[in-house]
Amino acid sequence: MSELYAEIYALVKLIPKGRVMSYGGVARHIGHANYSRVVGYALNALGAPGNKVKNVPWWRVVNSQGRISNSSTFDAADRQRDLLRAEGVEVGDDYRLSLRNYSAEVIVYEKLRKKLG
């Protein structure tokens, strides 16, 4: 696993249940504002055969419009919607949610600030 992917996974683990963050938000918080696609690639790699990384709540990352992104995996959007709903996030049948209501940006920023001292 690359160091960059490890940073992405560590940050995604900071997103609390019932909250979400955008791909771009994750990228900004790790210091690579233009790497939102890389965040997507890293999260997609979690499902790759032989991947040993566990306990990364990939479903808590959505696009910048508050929508679950389509995936190469047939049922991934439905799985993500169901996992978010199980955490209390209101996700519409159109796979949209309110970033205003569920964003973890400030929470993650505070966790990082405390961690870095």
Give short role names for the model-derived ranges:
Residues M1-G117:
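Nucleic acid-binding interface residues in structured DNA/RNA-binding domains
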